[in-house]
């Protein structure tokens, strides 16, 4: 009987856990829809801004703005974007390990490679292994463009002060509910991709001037790239958590089935044993 009670208690415990994982899956699904909408809205804006910078860059010198100047690389900063919460599969662990691989592979190129962490999980993983210059936590629950702009301003200020000569960001880009791609991008110095050669002969009129536009658009470009990486990470986090909770719910259902089978077999064996004892007692009385 003691064994039956322990099995039944475990079944109840697993059922309670399944209720929690199902609820978390539903919450993540609702949050994912909103996060996807934000990502879809941000991508075209970021792409068009990059396109304008490409056109400007074709007709400007590489040192037209301090944010485009390529210095002798001595110090670098890596911005690592993870989540504040867990229970999302390998979302945080995989990205933190990718960041560490980047550090180990590239540290020979820099005299100093420091980190800025966004999200508690990455900070906890990396703080005892590498130099964390700055940490931003608890920003995702109330994430806004203003938050991204403040982070971008910190990066630009440090770059202009020559605290570091290159800035990279690593984050999970959202592809689908099941897929998140670890993405590494260079933020500073800004190096717009060269456009199609067919566009070189096209003349554009810029108001008030190309230099004024660069001064205005380059900081905005950094803000948008930081904001997009945060939005991508949020959508990826909810997708990963939704997938993890769905898998956990299915595993719980499977475990409940196995435990129920074990419980029924044990109960049947206990009943059979009791019947045998009754029959044996009855036979001994007759004898």
Swiss-Prot record:
This is ATP synthase gamma chain. Coiled coil: none annotated. F-type ATPases have 2 components, CF(1) - the catalytic core - and CF(0) - the membrane proton channel. CF(1) has five subunits: alpha(3), beta(3), gamma(1), delta(1), epsilon(1). CF(0) has three main subunits: a, b and c. GO terms for molecular function: ATP binding; proton-transporting ATP synthase activity, rotational mechanism. Gene3D superfamilies: 3.40.1380.10, ATP synthase, gamma subunit, helix hairpin domain. It comes from Geobacter sp. (strain M21). CDD domains: F1-ATPase_gamma. Its main location: membrane. It is found in: Cell inner membrane. GO terms for biological process: proton motive force-driven plasma membrane ATP synthesis. GO terms for cellular component: plasma membrane; proton-transporting ATP synthase complex. PANTHER family: ATP SYNTHASE GAMMA CHAIN, ATP SYNTHASE SUBUNIT GAMMA, MITOCHONDRIAL. Belongs to the ATPase gamma chain family. Keywords: ATP synthesis, Cell inner membrane, Cell membrane, CF(1), Hydrogen ion transport, Ion transport, Membrane, Transport. It is a peripheral membrane protein. Produces ATP from ADP in the presence of a proton gradient across the membrane. The gamma chain is believed to be important in regulating ATPase activity and the flow of protons through the CF(0) complex.
């Amino acid at each position: 009987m003691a064994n039956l009670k322990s099995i039944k208690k475990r079944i109840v415990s697993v059922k309670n856990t399944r209720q929690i994982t199902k609820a978390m899956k539903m919450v993540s699904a609702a949050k994912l829809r909103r996060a996807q909408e934000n990502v879809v809205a941000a991508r075209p804006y970021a792409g068009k801004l990059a396109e304008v910078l490409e056109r400007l860059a074709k007709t400007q010198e590489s040192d037209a703005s301090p944010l485009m100047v390529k210095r002798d690389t001595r110090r670098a900063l890596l911005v690592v974007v993870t989540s504040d919460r867990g229970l999302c599969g390998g979302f945080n662990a995989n990205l933190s390990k990718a960041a560490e691989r980047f550090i180990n592979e590239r540290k020979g190129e820099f005299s100093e490679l420091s980190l800025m962490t966004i999200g508690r999980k990455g900070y906890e993983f990396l703080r005892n292994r590498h130099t964390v210059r700055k940490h931003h936590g608890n920003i995702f629950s109330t994430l806004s463009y203003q938050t991204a702009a403040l982070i971008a301003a910190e990066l630009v200020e440090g770059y202009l002060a020559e605290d570091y000569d290159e800035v990279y960001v690593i984050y999970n880009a959202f592809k689908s509910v099941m897929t998140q791609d670890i993405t590494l991008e260079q933020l500073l110095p800004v190096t717009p991709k060269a456009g199609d050669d067919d566009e070189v002969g096209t003349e554009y009129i810029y108001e008030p001037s190309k230099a004024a536009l660069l001064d205005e658009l380059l900081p905005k470009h950094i803000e948008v790239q930081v904001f997009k990486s945060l939005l991508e990470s949020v959508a990826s986090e909810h997708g990963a958590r939704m997938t993890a909770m769905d898998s956990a719910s299915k595993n719980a259902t499977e475990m409940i089935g196995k435990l129920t089978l074990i419980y029924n077999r044990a109960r049947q064996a206990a009943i059979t044993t009791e019947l045998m004892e009754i029959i044996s007692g009855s036979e001994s009385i007759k004898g």
